[in-house]
Amino acid sequence: IGDHGLERGLRFKKLTDTVRKERVAVIGSGPSGLSSAYQLARRGYPVTIFEAFDKPGGMLRYGIPSYRLPDEVLDGEIKNILDLGVELRCNMRVGADISFEELRKKYNAVYVAIGAHRGAKLNVPGEDSAGVYTAADYLNRINSGAKVDLGNKVVVVGGGDSAIDAARVSLRMAHKGSGDADQFDTESAQTVLDSARVSKRLSHAQVAILYRRTRAEMPAIGHEILEAEKE
């Protein structure tokens, strides 16, 4: 539906022409923050989004490879929300660049939508060593354009969608012969399986997925598992 709307230049419409006096601050521009801003703006509320990163989108931008969610689609959806009159202020970390108390004074309401950017940990010895990442942190680094040294062997622990994303992204990076994410078309993330698929695209790379249960019990989408194996 979203692609259909963007292709045809459809725009969101407000539900009222009344401009309300109550101002709302939204902390975070991920799915929750953008959704709240959209709903409030349609109802006539002046909304300002405060985003800590230099681009809006949250996990949509930094946790999903662009092969799943292309940047132009995400940018188009966000632009449609901003066109409702929503103000966006990036590189504004609440608690550093502006205090929460200041927001409370300037706005009638504050919606906190800071998201969940921390990945799950195994709580085992060695997981804090160099070269060990959670899927969330790894995909964030890649999508942010950070350089990541992968080496020739990658192991993805887990059987979910994020794993696949991480694997596939790794392979694409290795295939380009660079750890710079901005030199290849990054892909959106379904955490564990995706990582393995990316790593395997490199002819010289070795990628393995370790999962504690059986293949049939893997939570990743079935066709994603098959595509990862084909790669």
Where are these regions (language model features)?
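Residues forming the flavin
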Residues: 2-231
